[in-house]
Amino acid sequence: MATPVKLQFAAPKRGMPPVHMADLDEETLKERVQELGLPKFRADQIRRQYYGRLQGDPMEMTDLPESKRAAVKEALFPELMQPMRNMDADDGETRKTLWRLHDGTMLESVLMRYPGRATLCISSQAGCGMACPFCATGQGGLDRNLSVGEMVEQARAAASTMQEEGGRLSNIVFMGMGEPLANYKRVVETIRKVSAPAPDGFGISQRNITVSTVGLAPAIRKLADEEMKVRLAVSLHTPDDELRDELVPVNNRWSVEEVLDAARYYADTSGRRVSIEYALIRDMNDQPWRADLLGKKLRGALGTKVHVNLIPLNPTPGSKWDASPKDRQDEFVRRVEAQGVPCTVRDTKGQEIAAACGQLAAEER
């Protein structure tokens, strides 16, 4: 019997970052602005600059009194994250950014450009406590949860980059470092902020936001009750409990059946189709019978409200596993679709710079 893997649902007790303007609601921001000796309406100007014009430096907010900009910066705009390194791949279409946070913690985010859209893969935690053995992030353990401000700042930085290029950040996927539903409250607040229209947010449609989870079943149901329109992606990786206990250790807490029941509740409540993420690993979870079982289970649990996203395993340092050969991958797709479940192979970006799914490790190399 395998040795139980220790999971980290609660982040270690570490100091959270200083409060940033993006952490505050409208009324609290007005109070803070008044404490600086400014009238309330200046709070609206700050919000329009930050969310509407993507300006993160009060010293450049020309509609604020010049004599007050330094005070606004000190009180409301602490430097939460500093870019340490950018790495580009896919002929410049993919950029991975390594960030150093205020306490020295490191994290990564990935901006991916596609024809007609730009997607940010955002981190919700520094590290991850779910301990999936094929994922570089999970093997590094959990440092701490990210604040709302730290997540919103990842989005603002990416949106600003796209604006400079004459484009627009259109999609956000919570598929970076961390288990989003283990940082539940802050992730939900971040979603509401980035999806609100300016000057309350960046105006990114909730339908263009995806939240990925390894399967925290109660949190999936709770997310459904938030009545948001974000897409749910469940990292399933195998349809049977025996193997999933090993590949996704949280399965020892919530079984495949419990996770799929929660996913069905989410689909019924939100009206959104659920995405099932499946990293295809050679001789581990790519057998024809597993493809058949996956299709049958998903069809039974979710009916037509499901889509399988097959991910060729991305290499990580020291891993004993590798991706399935293409002929086996194609056969897997065929068998899943034979059960009436749509199945596509993900267009993996950023593999050469360790920016693809499961590769983020925030190492300062």
From Swiss-Prot:
Transmembrane segments: none annotated. The keyword Transferase applies. Gene3D superfamilies: 1.10.150.530, Aldolase class I. Disulfide bonds join C121-C357. It is found in: Cytoplasm. The keyword Methyltransferase applies. It catalyses: adenosine(2503) in 23S rRNA + 2 reduced [2Fe-2S]-[ferredoxin] + 2 S-adenosyl-L-methionine = 2-methyladenosine(2503) in 23S rRNA + 5'-deoxyadenosine + L-methionine + 2 oxidized [2Fe-2S]-[ferredoxin] + S-adenosyl-L-homocysteine; adenosine(37) in tRNA + 2 reduced [2Fe-2S]-[ferredoxin] + 2 S-adenosyl-L-methionine = 2-methyladenosine(37) in tRNA + 5'-deoxyadenosine + L-methionine + 2 oxidized [2Fe-2S]-[ferredoxin] + S-adenosyl-L-homocysteine. Its cofactor is [4Fe-4S] cluster. Specifically methylates position 2 of adenine 2503 in 23S rRNA and position 2 of adenine 37 in tRNAs. This is Probable dual-specificity RNA methyltransferase RlmN. It comes from Corynebacterium jeikeium (strain K411). The lineage of its organism: Bacteria, Bacillati, Actinomycetota, Actinomycetes, Mycobacteriales.
